[in-house]
Amino acid sequence: DFLFARTMIGVFKNIEYMCSRTNSKTWGKEAWKKIVVCVVSDGRAKINPRTRAVLAGLGVYQDGIAKQQVNGKDVTAHIYEYTTQIGMELKGNQVHLKPRSGVPVQMIFCLKEKNQKKINSHRWFFQAFGRVLDPNICVLLDAGTKPGRDSIYHLWRAFDLQPMCGGACGEIKAMLSHGKKLINPLIXA
């Protein structure tokens, strides 16, 4: 739940940043309507119960309605969608939900029935949601990765300025607690 929340807080801040770009032809006050946050979880039995509770608190998950079979056929995945106005904050390793003063966030949550690993989750994202949403760009983040407040905008801008660009990546910095230093410089490399 902590790692998931850290990532989502960063994503929410990026959406707010794009909405704050009032002089932009693409972004601005209504930018949140152009952005969909898709969360894919790998296996109903494997998802952390606290992460599931955070998703329920955001309004994008309902506990107890998922079934393994419908009309005698195995279910592959459970899909939930919601436009949330709930935010999060971290206090230590605790996740606290709170009303968002910022912009709404459109979310889709795909809870795969079986754990089929990360590459299968990526396939789900591109084949299932990519076809329906028809996005200009996609940004993939693992839970625990905290994007800077404008980093997703800069990734988008790289694609916007170079339409023939097929991929881009951002810089990842190690998050250290205040006052901590790495003693072994090889670990930092």
Swiss-Prot record:
Task: Tell me a GO cellular component.
Answer: plasma membrane
Bilayer disposition of the protein: Multi-pass membrane protein
E.C. code: 2.4.1.16
**Primary location class:** membrane
Q: Which GO terms describe its biological process?
A: cell wall organization; chitin biosynthetic process
Protein's cellular compartments: Cell membrane
Q: Which reaction does it catalyse?
A: [(1->4)-N-acetyl-beta-D-glucosaminyl](n) + UDP-N-acetyl-alpha-D-glucosamine = [(1->4)-N-acetyl-beta-D-glucosaminyl](n+1) + UDP + H(+)
Q: Which Pfam families match?
A: Chitin_synth_1
Q: Which GO terms describe its molecular function?
A: chitin synthase activity
Which keywords label this protein? Cell membrane, Cell wall biogenesis/degradation, Glycosyltransferase, Membrane, Transferase, Transmembrane
Q: What does this protein do?
A: Polymerizes chitin, a structural polymer of the cell wall and septum, by transferring the sugar moiety of UDP-GlcNAc to the non-reducing end of the growing chitin polymer.
Family, as annotated: Belongs to the chitin synthase family. Class I subfamily.
Q: What's the protein called, per UniProt?
A: Chitin synthase 1
Species of origin reads Ajellomyces capsulatus
- Taxon lineage: Eukaryota, Fungi, Dikarya, Ascomycota, Pezizomycotina
Gene transcribed to yield this protein: CHS1
